[in-house]
Amino acid sequence: MPSSPHPLLSAPKSPFIPHPFALIPLESNPPPVFRKIRQDSAARLRYPVLNISRRRAFTLTNKKKVAEIAPAKGKLGVLLVGLGAVSTTFIAGVEAIKRGIAEPIGSLTQMSTIRLGKRTDNRVPLIKDFVPLAALEDIVFGAWDIFPDSAYEAAMTAGVLEKELLAQLKPQLQKIKPMKAVFDQHYVKRLNGTNVKEGKNKMELAEQLIAEIAEWKRKNKCARLVMVWAASTEIFMKTHAVHKTLKSFEQAMRDNHKAIAPSMIYAYAALKSGIPFANGAPNLTVDVPALMALASQNSVPVCGKDFKTGQTWMKTILAPGLKARMLGLHGWYSTNILGNRDGEVLDDPESFKTKEESKLSVLEYILQPEVYPSLYKDFSHVVRINYYPPRGDNKEGWDNIDIFGWLGYPMQIKI
């Protein structure tokens, strides 16, 4: 990474900055601390990309700043916080693709192209051939979890993938055994496990993670690492005074302050280790001033405010379409039925509130009711998540959208 933060590298992902190199789809409504990106996006996009090839480094430059991105050499370690349904499906998928058992369907980096020059030039190389990204063969997985099950056992328990596929990958998946997790049931009420770290305070737990990360990197001979939070949704939290500065944040860790959640401890450990951090849950995590300052100080990129793979993804597709046609919205009702561990966690009102806040804010952010009050002011937006064990991991989602068009005539969309 460059020695000083570069806007394109250190900024969290935003819907206002096209970024073809993102590996993971994430929620498109950033928290308030990220929203200044909109004001700065034009400035960021001034930086042209020069001297780029599969084997050479990026050079991003303007008159004042130059930043280098080294080519992807050596192994890339992907450290996953949580080894449940999401992580094991991700790991098994990569292992299956590496062995020619499956195709990388849904992967932007592996299947999508990037246009060079004019459309008529017909220059559309695959992103993976144009950008110096790590090859799938160079990816190594590690994880933390509150349960000691290997990736194979966890995948079998989750029941997302077919047993026949998992049987073909069993040797690789059995090798991935989770390290003891940083966990506190106060933040995830419906779960408890035995594979948990102990420490006198939260700073000591962070120091254990930092040492563990360094040892894991050495043992697996990785050139670089990235950390992804793929664990359960924590209880709803607001920004606290201890989050304002790095000094107050670190003191709060030593004091075992309740405003420091486990996800923040992981993010802190990653950033102190110079490791990029992606948040795949709607938790208040890296998006606090103290951790954003640490990321900037160490020139480490961060991103994420929940994975975007289901109902919220559909909203971010449909809502811009309604807005583009200047169609009004009376209301949007969404419900989910799921019976997996995620559903069990979200059955707790405090964890559900974290998810609900994230899901509710996405429409307001896209539709801008303050700009178009006659179309979007005071629309009703209801989100329900129902835990129903017989459904298992086969989540079901329903949406009813009440819109109005020419002369105010009402219409309905059902998904």
Regions found by a protein language model. Name each.
Residues 11, 22, 42-43, 57:
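Ala/Thr-enriched low-complexity intrinsically disordered regions
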Residues 77, 81, 293, 300, ...:
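Active-site-lining helix/loop region of Rossmann-like oxidoreductase modules
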Residues 58-281, 285-297, 311-319, 412-415:
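Metallocofactor- and cofactor-centric catalytic cores in central/energy metabolism, strongly enriched
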Residues 277-281, 302-306, 330:
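Short catalytic-loop micro-motif centered on adjacent basic/acidic residues
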Residues 23-40, 44-51:
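Short, positively charged and aromatic/hydrophobic N-terminal segments
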Residues 6, 17, 37-38:
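Short linear segments in intrinsically disordered or otherwise low-structure-confidence regions
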